[in-house]
Amino acid sequence: MIKVWIDTDVGGDIDDALALLLAMSSKQLEIVGVSTVYENTLARARIAKTLLALGGKGDVPVYVGESTPLRATYVHTIPLDINRLPKTYEEDVFGNAVVEYNAVEALHKALNTYQEINHNVYT
């Protein structure tokens, strides 16, 4: 099995949710962790954890990542609002994100733990 880490802004457009669902259903991939980025990363982490739980992968840890770019300047014309919820979700999400580590620390730990983890970047 190929070990993968998924860094996502799930909760915006449907693409990240579909990618997460496809990864969960793959017999060739093992998701070792998920981190969230962009704006309200805690809400995104809860959405990711909910999707994982619904897909029978509730044991996969989800980490809250950075709300703003670490190095680059924010270039979108709409002001960045780290408190804005991703899209509008009427239903309650029941997932819980891991907050003992930040996403960068968690990914670093995973890369050291799983030497064979796929660390390619896809956008």
Predicted features and spans:
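N-terminal acidic, glycine/proline-rich low-complexity segments
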Residues: M1-T123
